Each structure stands twice: as structure tokens, then as C-alpha cells.
């Protein structure tokens, strides 16, 4: 079992994320990723997600192994306004895999130019051990 999405009977299916995920296997925990050098929120999101995919590949995993993404965003108004571009950046990097997610508005991040930081947790089946 790679993972199982938790979808209680009678709950509406959330758009673009899962309320919960059950998984077993080798854990991959990634530090927060930012969009180094990218201009604007959606571009920084695209770069941060590409960084996450690169790190997953380094571990022998892929986007399909993601269990959770925690997004820290400095401008929630821009987040809401740019949903189409953010969705496109997400689909380009991750595809149609939707792990558990939280989006948290913050006043600032450690890097002054960073508009978003994304942390990731993934689990690979034990057969992916190297």
C-alpha cells in the first residue's frame, strides 16, 4: 500500500487536497523549500514545488509518494487571487496527486524575498529502499 486517502462517508471531497492520508514505508521529510530567484508568488510556488520533486527524486521517490505539504504564505490576498496560476504550477510539478495540505498565512519568512515556503513529507513503499 503506497498510501490511502481518508475520506469519511458523508464528508464532501475537498478540492485539491486530502483531509488525511495513511501510509507505511520509508519516510522522506523535507525542509521548507522556497522559490530562489523566481519573481512573484505563483513563480516562487512553481520553483519551490520543483525543488521538492528534485529532492524526492534524490530519495528514490516521486510526487505520488507525498503525504503532506505545509505552505507558509506571506500574502494570503495574493494566494486567493492567483489560484488559477498556482493550480497550474502545482499540476506542472506534482500532477494530479493531492496529499494532505495546510496553507498558513505568516507575516514574513527568513529569506526577505521569499513569498512562500513549502515543507513536504512523503513515504515510499519498502520496496523502494536502496
Residue ranges: model-predicted function:
Residues 2-130:
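Short, polar/acidic, helix-capping and beta-turn segments at strand->helix junctions
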